[in-house]
């Protein structure tokens, strides 16, 4: 699966598989001034709600729980990345995202969920 994703051009790739940097950046500049992270989604959602309140904008309500497929336990993630070739493919395909959103972390820290 990952080999196909990695070898498919952005133009032909489903939007759900595109690197986020292709969607959120223009000329390598991040356009939104707030981007939540999956790892801190509850906290980020609260921060977004507070910002909307301060600006007098409508609240979004509770964070929707759509497409939830697993619990918050991600201890099995390192098992998926034991193969250095797989790590290479991911970092090549999604390297801009890793740099943009996790530039202060090493690949190993990301794999371990740190």
Residue map of PLM features:
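PAPS-dependent sulfotransferase catalytic domain
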Residues: 1-80
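PAPS-dependent sulfotransferase catalytic core
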Residues: 25-26, 58-114
